[in-house]
From Swiss-Prot:
Lineage: superkingdom: Bacteria
Any one GO MF annotation of this record: transaminase activity
Protein name, entry field: Aminomethyltransferase
InterPro entries named in the record: GCS_T, GCS_T_bac, GCST_C, GCV_T_N, GcvT/YgfZ/DmdA, GcvT/YgfZ_C, TrmE/GcvT_dom1
Gene name of this polypeptide: gcvT
Subunit structure: The glycine cleavage system is composed of four proteins: P, T, L and H.
Native species: Pseudomonas putida (strain ATCC 47054 / DSM 6125 / CFBP 8728 / NCIMB 11950 / KT2440)
Assigned EC number: 2.1.2.10
Family that this chain belongs to: Belongs to the GcvT family.
């Protein structure tokens, strides 16, 4: 038996099929993964993501400490509620984890992946020496992600007028604290939506309110196909400690300026650039019948081979799609080996669908 969120019994009551995910027993779907996927693209759905790790960071050195720890620069978060995405790198530039960091009134809040919890906390503790900084894990909090074009509208209708007004005013990648609730306009689906971090003892009642308002409970299966269509990396598949942001379509998340900010991994990344980045993360589209899966070999004629990192059937495109790490010189065509046979695939930018629009 794995760890369970406070909503586990409610998930079962709603008909969830559960699976192990990073040591947690989590809902895979509540009957139909494909229906949940389409519901989020067209309306909205709610995901329990309380298995993720919330870490509050405070102290007089909180900013300079995070400026050293993260590839992105928290100095860009000039107001409480502002958020940014960042890789957390090792000395060689490999990705220990990827996370969201929010500016709070007194410091910062990090939301990291569930499966990386132990190694992230060990890394933070190791890098704490010499800094006046404190960090606290918050297992008392629940996290619900309400995602889809009607998410903000439907959630606002359930809240007090004052809290609803805060939601309507939120810009993308901004959050706001309201009492013991923190509401952010962020997500992992490629749609508009909210991620709400709030006291766990209120989780069951609020989840029931959301479902009662017609917001579909949605599982990790739909979350995975939604994020894949959106070209969002999954830690442990598309990114890990053996690959850098430069080979993972995450170069945009590195803040190189100011040049004197010597964040952990900077030297390794600069060395990779100096020697020439050898690989890139691309999207693949299979035009024939079949399913692209992780670890299938990608062959690029006259250039070399790569590997699929994530692959699945796309409910929006009605085709199989994938993310793959391939040689840098790869053009717009390649082949994938499926059960001993080679199939042609189209190579595209690794973003297939965003905000309901097909981009390929």
């Amino acid at each position: 038996m794995g760890q369970r969120t406070l909503l586990y019994d409610l998930h079962l009551a709603l008909g969830a099929k559960t699976v192990d995910f990073g040591g947690w027993d989590m809902p895979l779907h509540y009957g139909s993964q494909v229906e949940e996927h389409h519901q989020v693209r067209s309306d909205c759905g709610v995901f329990d993501v309380s298995h993720m790790t919330v870490i509050d960071v405070d102290g007089t050195d909180a900013t300079v400490w995070l400026q050293r720890l993260l590839a992105n620069d928290v100095a860009r978060l000039d107001d409480p509620g502002k958020a940014l995405y960042s890789p957390l790198l090792n000395e060689q530039g490999g990705v220990i984890d990827d996370l969201i960091v929010y500016r709070t009134e007194t410091g910062y809040r990090l939301v990291t992946n569930a499966a990386t919890r132990a190694k992230v906390l060990d890394w933070l503790q190791l890098q704490r020496a010499g800094f006046s900084v404190d960090f606290q894990v918050r297992p008392d909090l629940a996290i619900l992600a309400i995602q889809g074009p009607r998410a903000r509208e439907k959630v606002a209708a359930l809240l007090s007028p004052a809290r609803a007004a805060l939601i309507r005013e939120l810009r993308p990648f901004e959050g706001v604290a309201d009492g013991d609730w923190f509401i952010a306009r962020t997500g992992y689906t490629g749609e508009d939506g909210l991620e709400i971090i709030f006291p766990g003892d209120q989780a069951v009642a609020f989840f029931n309110d959301l479902v009662g308002a017609g917001i579909a409970p949605s599982g990790l299966g739909a979350r995975d196909t939604l994020r894949l269509e959106a070209g969002m990396n999954l830690y442990g598949q598309d990114i890990d400690e053996n690959h850098t942001p430069l080979t993972s379509n995450l170069g945009w998340s590195i803040a190189w300026e100011p040049a004197e900010r010597n964040f952990i991994g900077r030297v390794g990344l600069l060395a990779e650039i100096e020697h020439g980045v050898q690989e890139k993360l691309v999207g693949l589209v299979l035009e024939e019948r079949g399913v692209l899966r992780a670890h299938q070999v990608v062959r690029v004629a006259g250039i070399g081979e790569g590997e699929i990192t994530s692959g699945s059937f796309s409910p929006t495109l009605s085709k199989s799609i994938a993310l793959a790490r391939v040689p840098m010189a790869t053009g717009d065509r390649a082949e994938v080996e499926i059960r001993g046979k080679w199939y042609p695939v189209r190579v595209v930018k690794p973003t297939f669908v965003r905000h309901g629009k097909i981009l390929i």
